[in-house]
Amino acid sequence: GYYPVNKKTVENNENWGNNAETIVSNGPYKLLSWQHNGELNFVKNENYWDADEVVTKTMNWPISESQSTRLTLVEGGEADMMVEPPVADQQRLEEAGLLHIGPMLGNYYYLFNVKAEPFTNPDVRKAFSMVINRKEIVKNIVKGGKEEAYAFVPYGMLESNGTDDFREAGSYLVYEDVEQAKELIKEAGYDENHPLPPITILYNTSEMHKAIAEAIQATWHKAFGADVRLQNQETKVFLANREAGKYQVARASWVADYGDPQNFLEVFSAEDNDSQYHSE
């Protein structure tokens, strides 16, 4: 997406967006203070074009990577709302009328580093994708009204004709077939005598990310006998390593900045694609 920024602010300080003292924005709120890894504090922006419609004058956002900690803050009266409560608590919260599920233009996926073995081979990447049971992961781990994804662009955005859903018009691009996946691995030269190299899944700290990684770890080991290891990192370190390509498999997600398929597809032509791939 594109948002206007103050030219002088950007030119005078390349890190202008990293601290409350230097950040400049034009939304309904101003960032009053920012305690990194602690809390964000906002006040109403009286210069906002629609300020009369902004009812809440202040907002405080506690920061925590832990879903359980965020839920404790809400249930303890220290916060009013949160996103993504722990899966184990979702049914209880829904029955109590506290969990509200709404549509979101987003996806959750795993990146294969196309420059790291064994994922330099597209057939290996395809095979590893083909054995993942997305429906079971959504049903037993993710929950919360999510849907399994069989293509990169989610439902909810229009085709170029302005009437059809882009995802429905494009059909599925991914399918599950364990036996075919095993054949692809054999064709790639891997078997009992030439096993796959150890594989590490990189993810940032979260109960849900961990549970998904464990499920996929078990799936890949069962299907291919792969030695799959898990590595979690604090978000800042995780993002830096993922961007630098210091991983084999890494979790990722994307929420649309605007409602057009281009917002998802443009990543494939970007030279800074985190999977180290870009289309000419």
Language model features: what each stretch is:
Residues G1-E53, T58, E183:
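Gly/Pro-rich hinge or "lid" segments in bacterial periplasmic/extracellular proteins
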Residues G17-A20, E46-R92:
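Ligand-site clamp/hinge motif
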Residues Q90-I101, K246, D260-S275:
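Ligand-binding "clamshell"
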Residues V138-K139, Y172-Y175, A226-E243, N263-E280:
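Extracytoplasmic/peripheral linker and loop segments enriched in polar/acidic and small residues
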